[in-house]
Amino acid sequence: NLMAIDFTDESVYLVVARQKRNELEIIKMASANLPEGVVLNSEIIDPITLKDVISDLMEQHSITAKYAFFALGNTNIIARSVDVAASVQNDEDIEGLVSYELQQYLDIDPTSYVIQFQEQESNSAFPLDEDTRSLMVYAVPKSIVEQYLGLANNLKLTPYVFDLQSNTFEKWLERVQAINNRAKRLTQENVGMVHLSKSFIGVYLYSEGKFVTSNYLNRGYKDILSYADDASLLQKLPAVASDDLDTGLLKHALDEWVADAKNHILNTENFFSGSTGLNIDSFYVFGDQDICWQLAAILKQSMNREFISIDNVDYENVLWEGSAEFNAEFIPATAMLIRRAN
């Protein structure tokens, strides 16, 4: 069995699957809350507690697996577009040029990072000349990679894939056939994936299925939850945002979150537009469905843009077995396995 392990500052998510030819069968899903301070911005602060929580979760749900999949998406990842001469073809030579670029312009020690790069496709708005190759470079701190490898070892799992969430979402987009029972071909649009949680806002932007840029803000909706002290009030957030309800501190927390979210999303889209000459057609919001559809509706109204809260998804060649069923909070973990199946 293949198991994807996804965790935020507040929760851990497990998705177990098996692959049969080109089909991915998702057989088990489980999640648990994490004590405060165990994980911070994707960094493992307390590896013993994290290992214990995951081990208990696996035991409770009778989960067995051999391989572990991880994906990373946080502020410590450096993503930068680098142009190199088309004549440079050898990977070692390219890595040397990329390392020099990072050291010169970002003032980092490249030996402390795991560096990956992939060629970017030219677009009609900003075509490259024939003598230049454009690369998207990712630099991940080695210390974080070692934390994840250590976690897999402590769980007695083989770390099969260590990836970036931006890459896994790219493959996820390819498999989507419908969202909220409406047919979608997301690889034919310019789309934004917006991940909302208690602790962060993650934005990933794609042009016709190809990753362009991402941005991560440590600004979750935790304060909103602390003032929405009952479920009925949580369901009325759009009314709070539009001043139809006077809720004092909740209104203030919501207004601050919306302002920060708007700026974060627009700043990320501005970079996307500067790189491609295009704008995002639709933003797809995912996370805890009890609050995300409310926040998506507020962003749609506030920004006059298309924000769609993901409630269900139909995939190509992805099957749900037993008690496993779609849940938007598990999209990042599911995307890890879909990337492997591709």
PLM feature segments, named:
Residues 1-101, 105, 146:
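Non-catalytic, solvent-exposed interaction/assembly segments
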Residues 3-6, 11-28, 64, 70, ...:
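Small-residue (GG/TT-enriched) beta-loop-alpha framework at ligand/catalytic clefts
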Residues 223-280, 288:
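Adenine-nucleotide phosphate-binding core of ATP-dependent small-molecule kinases
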Residues 72-177, 312-316:
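Active-site neighborhood for divalent-cation/phosphate handling
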Residues 310-342:
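Glycine-rich phosphate-binding/hydrolytic loop that grips phosphoryl groups
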Residues 278-305:
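Glycine-rich phosphate-binding loops at beta-strand->alpha-helix junctions
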Residues 63-75, 152, 158-161, 275-288:
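Short glycine-rich phosphate-binding loop at a beta-alpha junction
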Residues 49-62, 179-189, 268-269:
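Phosphate-interacting basic helix/loop segments used at nucleotide- and nucleic-acid interfaces
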